[in-house]
Structure formats: structure tokens, C-alpha cells
Amino acid sequence: MGNDEYTKKLEKVIQELIRPIKNLPFHLIIKSLSGYEVDKFNPDDENHRITLEALKEVARLSCRLINKEGIKRKRANEVGNDIEKFVKEAFIKFDYKADKPTTSAGKKKSTGYPDLEFCVLDNQYHYLECKSYNVKNMNSSMRTFYLSPAKDFKITHPGIHFIICFEIYQDHREDDFNVYKTRGWKILDAYNLDIDLKYEFNSDNRRLYKPDLILAEEDI
């Protein structure tokens, strides 16, 4: 095969790769990545109902904690980074178990999906992702949910995958920061969430700074 023909075939493969795959079912993606089933919330299951009622208590207390302290951030899209600590504090105040998930290697991991692993009934653990939203952007197509494959994945058992979302608004300014508070919450079941797959190209420093790429450099 000549170089030109090979290059054309490679270009076609790349073009196919970069086309996003849309509306993949969340529960099947998690099963494929982790080997564990995602449980769908069942309103007829007493244990599921008890768990949801506990999450409602946690959501209400989280709102009070957020509004008492406020969240200082430059931009609204950064607020979600601070939500988790308030939710975890609320779990603890109710004597529920909640912590960063333990990976398959037995380590606590903060980055990546999901934010928390929790238990309100003995030995019944579920997962929780914490989010913030602005009601004005509820119907936007902006990406707000991310899930990346990892060798040391944070899903190590079956369970319900809940998402807790807080509506935030800018209350006032303080020390060159916006102070955000919340006026409501939603609890979601991620089982039927549709997610898209979009490929990403990346490199690393070893390849980025190799000598044949450097055009000029200088130490000062």
C-alpha cells in the first residue's frame, strides 16, 4: 500500500472516530466499565423509599448549610466544586455514612465520577453525584455531566446512582468574589440518563517537548 493510500485510509478512520456517539444509556455504560449493575430506583421498594427520604433530609440540611456560609467563587460554573463538602457534612450530621468512593485498588479517590458513596441503611451502599445549576440554563445543551473511563474506577458494587442538584444564585459580592446561595434542590435517578461519547486527542510532556518539535528556546 502506497503512502498516499495509507494516509487517505487513516484520515477516514480519524473522521469516523471523531463523530460523537449520542444517547448511550448510562446504566449500560457503567455496567460495561465496572462490571456492576446500576439499580433503578423502585418506588415500591421500601428500602429505596427510605433511602430517598434520607436524601431529602440531606438536601434540606445542605441548603441550610450552604446559605449560612455562602459559596465564594468568581464564576457560577465553579460553584459545583464546593457543593460536595456541604452534602457530606449533612450526611454526617444525620449519622449516615458518606465518603469518597473506594476504588478497586482499595484507595479513596476524589477525582472523577461519582463524588460520594453513601449508606443510610446497614450495608446498602449507593452512589451520589453533586451538581449545581442555574434555573435559566435548565434547557441548555451545555455539557454539565462527565464520566471518564479509568483503570482504577470508583464503582465497585451495584447500587442506585443518585444525582443531587442545587439551584444556585448570586446573593452578593464580597472581597472581589461572588457569594452564591441556593433556593432549591432536585434529586435525580441516573439510571435512564442518556449520555454522549466524544473522543479526545491528547499527548504528554515527553512527546510535546521532544527536540525535533522545538523551534527556539532560551534560558534567562
Task: Enumerate the language-model features and the residues they cover.
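Short, well-ordered strand-loop elements centered on a beta-strand within folded domains, enriched
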Residues: 124, 170-194
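Catalytic cores of nucleic-acid endonucleases
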Residues: 130-175
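Short connector loops at helix/strand junctions that flank enzyme active sites
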Residues: 111-113, 123, 158
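Short, hydrophobic, well-ordered secondary-structure elements
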Residues: 80-88, 161, 165-167
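Conserved catalytic cores of phosphodiester-cleaving nucleases, focusing on short active-site segments
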Residues: 91, 116-118, 126-134
